[in-house]
Design a protein with these regions (language model features):
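Assembly/oligomerization scaffold segments
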Residues: 1-117, 170-173
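Charged- and aromatic-enriched interaction segments used to assemble
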Residues: 93-98, 102-173
Length: 173
């Protein structure tokens, strides 16, 4: 176990993530820099920006902090992000590609429920079970189910400006 108050060596590793199994598949070796922004006020809870020398295309990337202390190496996950929107520049020697990356919640934020989408009270489905089912259905990220037996007391209908993310958040609230 790392003693975070003592000295250690630190580095970072970046892996492409299989969107089906959600496992690391390939180490990315061409990352020049990375910034992670965590924002509890943002709907998707944060983002990241990666500077690379090659385009990797749209994919999920998992970022790890690697620590070495007293000869013990540990890998600490910092987040998994959907990488997209590359912009590039070339200074004559080095190609620099900046890629924006977003938490997996982006998939739920970009899609809307059909007009009039409703979870009816009569289905007798627990609220958190319904939230889990919808999050799992409309995103590729694994979703951990929450335990709750609370049921709807009335029909729950999506608003015209709801995204799947806002609908699920409102349902679970």
């Amino acid at each position: 176990m790392i003693d975070w108050t003592s000295t250690m060596q630190q580095t970072y590793e970046f892996y492409i993530v299989d969107p089906i199994s959600w496992k690391d598949t390939k180490l990315i070796r061409n990352v020049k820099s990375c910034t992670i922004n965590r924002d509890s006020t943002a709907e998707t809870l944060g983002s990241a920006s990666l500077s690379m020398t090659e385009i990797i295309g749209e994919c999920y990337v998992r970022i790890y902090l690697i620590t070495i202390q007293n000869g013990v190496k540990e890998k600490h996950p910092l987040g998994t992000y959907l990488v997209q929107t590359p912009s590039s520049s070339y200074d004559g020697r080095i190609k620099d590609i900046t890629m924006d990356a977003y938490t997996p919640l982006l998939e739920l934020k970009e899609k809307q429920p059909p007009l009039g989408f409703t979870i009816e009270k009569k289905t007798n489905e627990a609220i958190m079970t319904a939230a889990h089912r919808l999050a799992q259905e409309y995103s590729r990220a694994p979703v951990v189910p929450a335990k709750s037996t609370t049921k709807l007391t009335s029909n729950f209908t999506a608003g015209t400006d709801d995204t799947w993310l806002s609908f699920i958040n409102d349902l679970a609230a």
